[in-house]
Structure formats: C-alpha cells, structure tokens
Amino acid sequence: MMPGPRPRKGPQARGQGVAAAKQMGLFMEFGPEDMLLGMDEAEDDEDLEAELLALTGEAQTTGKKPAPKGQAPLPMAHIEKLAADCMRDVEEEEEEEGLEEDAELLTELQEVLGVDEETEPLDGDEVADPGGSEEENGLEDTEPPVQTAVLTASAPAAQAGASQGLHALLEERIHNYREAAASAKEAGEAAKARRCERGLKTLESQLASVRRGRKINEDEIPPPVALGKRPLAPQEPANRSPETDPPAPPALESDNPSQPETSLPGISAQPVSDLDPDPRALLSSRQREYKVAALSAKRAGELDRARELMRIGKRFGAVLEALEKGQPVDLSAMPPAPEDLKPQQASQAPTAPSVIPPAVERVQPVMAPDVPATPVAPTESQTVLDALQQRLNKYREAGIQARSGGDERKARMHERIAKQYQDAIRAHRAGRKVNFAELPVPPGFPPIPGLESTMGVEEDAVAATLAAAEKLASAEDSAPADKDEDEPPGHLQGEPPAQAPVAKKPARPTVPSSQRLPEPRASSSKESPSPSVREQLALLEARKLQYQRAALQAKRSQDLEQAKAYLRVAKWLEAQIIQARSGRPVDLSKVPSPLTDEEGDFILIHHEDLRLSQKAEEVYAQLQKMLLEQQEKCLLFSKQFMHQGNVAETTRFEKLAQDRKKQLEILQLAQAQGLDPPTHHFELKTFQTVRIFSELNSTEMHLIIVRGMNLPAPPGVTPDDLDAFVRFEFHYPNSDQAQKSKTAVVKNTNSPEFDQLFKLNINRNHRGFKRVIQSKGIKFEIFHKGSFFRSDKLVGTAHLKLERLENECEIREIVEVLDGRKPTGGKLEVKVRLREPLSGQDVQMVTENWLVLEPRGL
C-alpha cells in the first residue's frame, strides 16, 4: 500500500512567526542609550539620579524622570572639566615618578648626604621604608619627591650594620673556595675544581647583593669545603719564575699605614679607589695602550718586547676583575705608559730584583712595573711531578700569549701539548708508565729528574749517526788480529791505512749499532708479537743494519751525499720498526730493496808474480757470471713476494741472495790470490715464485706491440717497399668510448720492429672490463701508409684474446694476420701486462741449475 501525501497544515495566524523569532532571540531591539546608561532596572535608581544631578549642578525635581531615549546629553563644559581633571591626575603621577627616577637629583642627593655609591641600592622598590610605604598605609603619595629619595637612601645605611657579619662570612667563604679550587687544579681533580668554581660564583653574586643592600637567603650560602693536601707546597717562592706563576689576588690597602697589607677588605676604612675619580676607565685605557703597543712591536719584528708588553697588559685584566668584585686596589704601582716603560726598566733593572721581598711579590704581583725583559731560566725541579707541572704551566701561558697575539694556529698547538702534559700527569699520579721521551720540552728547561735526555741526537740525525758509525769503526779496528781471514800477516803490515777494513771483516756480524736506537720504548706493549710480526721485525732490522753499514762505507770513501742518503733510508726503516713493534701494520712493498754492492766489502789483493792460465780465467769468468745471475733472480723473487706481503718467502730469497753474494766474494778472493778455480757442482732446485709487475698501477694495463713478421704487402707494393703501422682498438669502458691508438710508421720492410708501449686505463672490479676480457679482447689492423694523394691501405687484421689474464699477469702471443678470414702468412707479436692477475696469483714453478762451490776447492 503506497503512503499518501501528508496533510497540509492550515495557514499560520498573522503575527505568530514574528513572536516565535523574538522568542528565539531574533529581531531584538537595541538602543544606544540603553547600552550606555545601563540596564532597565537601573533607570529608577534614586541614588544614581542624585549623584548625576550633583555633578551637573541642577536641582532635583520631584517629577517623574523622563525616559532615557528622551534625555538630553550632558553639557560640553562639564565633559571638558571632567576630562581635564582626569588628565591632571595622570600628569601629576608621571611627574612624581619622574622625580623618583631622576639620576641627576639622586646624584645631587648623594653628594649632600655623603652616601657611598656602592652602598646605595640600585632599585628603590627593593628596600622600602616601613614607615613610609604607601602599600602598607594605603595612603596617596602626596609627599615631595625629595623626601622619598631621602628615605630610600637612608634605608641601606640602616641595613649595613646588620649585614656586617654576613659580609665577613661571605668573604671568608669566598677565600675558602678559592683555595679549594686552586688546590683541586694543582691536584688535577677537574670535577672538584669545577664544583668549587660554581660555588665561588654563587658566593660572589651573594656578596655583590649584600653590598648593594639586597637581602639574601642565608640557607643558600654554600657550605665550607675541605682544602685537602696540595701535592707540592712551594718552599722557595722567590725562585719561582714569573712566567709560570698564576696571577695572585691584588693587594689590599687601608688608610692606616701600620696595618698589614693582607687585611680583609671589610676592615679597610677608606679604599684607595675613592681618591681616583674613575680608576676603571684609567686601567682599561692603559691596558688597551699596552695591547696596541704589543701588536705594533710584533709587526715590527720585536717579539721579546711584544711578549713583555702583552704580559703586562694581561695583569691589568686581573686588577679590573678585582675592581669589579668590589676589592680596593693600589694604583700607585701601576706601570707607566708603554712608551715610558723601556727607559724606566733600563734604569731599574740592576736594583729591582733585590728590593721586593718574596711575600710582597706573592701579595701584589699584578701591577709590578719591573718585569724582566729576558725570560728567566726555570729552576731545576726535584720531582717528576713538579717538572711536568712546570712544563704544563709554560705551555698554557704560551697558548694564552699566542691567542692574545692573534696566532690561533700556534695557540691550538700549545693547547694540544698542554693536553699531553695533563694526560701524563694524570697517568703518573695513577702509577702508570709514562713515556717522557714523547713529550715536547720547552726551550731552556732542564731534563726531567731521574731521566736522561735521549732526544739530543734528533737535532742533527745525520751527524749523530755518522758519529756512531765512527765509534763502530774504532771498535772494529781494535778487534784482535787472530780473527782475520786466511791472509799472510806480513802483507797486512805493508798495506796503507785506507785498506784497514781487511782486519775488521770478521767483526761485522757483531755490529752493536743495531742496539743503539732507543728501542725499549716498544717494550711497553703487553702482548708478545706474533710470528709474522717477528719475521717482519727481523727483515726490517737486517735491512736497516745493511744500510747503516753502507753509510759507513760511503763516509770512509768521502762520499757524504751517498752516506746521508743511506742514513735517511736507515732512519725510515727505524720508524717502520717502531711502528711494527707497536702493533700497527707495515707496508712491505715500500721497504727498499737490499743493496747490491758490486765492489763487495773486501779488498782485492793483487799479486804481480801470479799468473793464471787462460782456461782458469775463463772458468772464473763463467762462475762469476752464473753467481751474479742467480743473485739477481733471488732479489727479483724476493721483491715479488714482498709486494705480496709474504714475509717468509721474502726472507728466504734474501738469504739465498746473500749466499750467492758470499760465494761470489770467495770466488773473487781466490782469483785475486792466484789460486785454481774451486771445485764446484750443480744442483737442481725448484722454486715456487709469484709473478707480479710492481711498477704497474692497479688501474692501468700495458699493451706492447713488439714486431711484425712477414707482413703481406697490398697489390702494387713490393714487400721491401711496405711502410707498415698498426692501429688497435680496445672496447673499454664501452664501444662508443673505445681506447684507440696506433704505432709509428716503419718504412721499407715487411718485418717491422715496433717495440712500442701503450698504457690503457682499466678498472679491475668493473663488470664491463671483465666482460671485455672474456669476450672481445683487442683488435689490431695493419696498414700500409699512403702517399699525399693516396689513402692508407689495409693489409690485414689480427685479434688477441685476453682470457688468460684471469690467472696470469702477462700474455705474450704471436697472433696471425688475416685478410677477412683467410690467413695471409704474416704474424704480429704483442704483449699485455697487468700488475696482478684478475683472480688469484700467478704462481710459477721455476727449476734452476744451482751452482754450489765446495770449500775444499780453496
């Protein structure tokens, strides 16, 4: 059943919609008179009407008050009068407030009353008079402004007597915290020093508040702290260097001349600063003059005078700080202007150090005018800790001077050195071992007590090592004569002094120069070195000893430049030894190769009456040639294993090279003595070697086009008229950016010798390079050079595959020259080299006929 339409409502009665809207708050009538004069219930208030009539001056009527809508506005004269009254009240209040805050009136009042500026409160609202407070009495402030200022200024004077005990307590507590902070800094307790400094700042702020007349909470005063034991009390303050002493607090002075200078500031009756109208401005201007003069002296190159002026200028900062804290200072000893300082110091220099007693120097060193122009040498310390502290203070002062002079780099350097000394002091106090040789020493400082200076030889390393070599030579010359070789003793007596090394050859294996260096510093490592590290150390020490001996031989032969070069290498090897002992890795590929002394370290003895047969000379020459070849092979294999980092194989081949050298020396000595060639035989020895081209980088590949053999000539050209050149193309990094080049033209031959090297850029780990190696290789094209009107003619092509570079570091092939796919009979010899194979190592087994000399043959 479908719902029917809703029944329509009847027409709404007229006026019902407006009534509903008014009921909902719409169409409300607002009158401006209602909003200004108030609500309806206040219209018939008789009190308000009477007050209004009294204000307007009209008589009260008994009739009914007209409606607000018909009320006439107030006369303009009354409105202007009310506005003038309101404005007059505000102006009077502002005028009174301006009188209370007028600085000129307050200054004039202080001069009349004689009240000190420091004891006057900064804000009159904080110290209020209980009798004249307008908040407590609720009265209007109708008193004159001068009377208010008098009450405000007299309040702190009443409170000054009550705060005498609190003032003395705060000063005593400040003195306690300063001593505790200094003791903690000397003991190296940074945390305690920071706590004391925070408490000191709190006490200073509380003392400043008390001096200004403000109230403080006594419960918030920091408690006293224990001073503790200072590590070293200075027994001779007169001998202390002014450069290492921290700035002492300024001297205190009172009106009474018989009163000691160390009296407290609260006891002094009249501070000296009252005699000077503005001591702070005078001190600031004088400090600025000294800084400008120091900067000018530094720019002029007078560094000593610049340091002196900067040191005096820094002392003004301590005096200004004391003046800000309210402490009285004595300006009678203030240094003069910088331009008057130099003649005054020259006249006072002979008598100044003996006039001032030590006590006065400690109480009032801030404004001392007689600063020594030259730095005083520090006294020798009695303990290690005292010496370290002296050096720490020296470097701190140097850092401050450098920063004040604008040299930030030098300041950071001195701060780093000071940090090293702080760590050393902390470690020494903890009982740990400290390597004092690594700490820099300031100029002019004596050595640390109980330790010998081991750094003197570093000033001239070459001269010191040569001197040690001279001692070694003198020690070897004094060796017994019964340790000589099998030589006629009468012959040695007839030799000149330049041939004296014959007698010292047996003593060379026991050269003490390997123990000369300060190697015990590496003994601080707790773990014993591993076998590989021991092998590295043995290799490096043997190599260093070899270069030291070579330097000694070069010095004896008057070749000082060569001796210095060998000593530099020995010093570098010494640094590598220290690095290896400390556990850090050493790059053996950078270790220099062993020296190959072609002349040998022996003397050839020539006998005029000895003549060898032609056959014996040929045998000697052949044996020497074989020994030299075997020695060179051993050195080559040793170098290859060194670049691989294989210490064991490197040492093995170096020993074989030394054995070959020794056999060669024996052979040459036998030949010099005129003996028959020694008995010898050959042994087959197989060596496992690793091939590497150390002169190549890992990012380059060498292509060498060696020669062409029987290259075909193009039609119309005879083989003898062939002008051939080779062009190659290597598709890396891609085909569009292939690396291309060509050889020079070799004319008039079909077997040209090119022997030309090309360097190709590669990336061993790139996938594109490996793809080119495995699939594409290198393409070669052989051309015949055309004439002026003729272009180049293609002779043939060749292709070299590079898959063998995966396991080999060199490919040497003779590739066939093709004409399309047809062989032409020509050949092209090429080589490709990498530093190392792409994967693995190029291990080769080499078999040699090893020459062995029998000792019985001599």
UniProtKB/Swiss-Prot annotation:
The modification Phosphoserine is found at residues 209, 593. Residues 166-212, 611-635 form a coiled coil. SUPFAM superfamilies: C2 domain (Calcium/lipid-binding domain, CaLB). Residues 676-815 form the C2 domain. Pfam families: C2, CC2D1A-B_DM14. The gene is CC2D1B. This is Coiled-coil and C2 domain-containing protein 1B. Residues 186-199 have a biased composition (Basic and acidic residues). It is found in: Nucleus. It comes from Homo sapiens (Human).
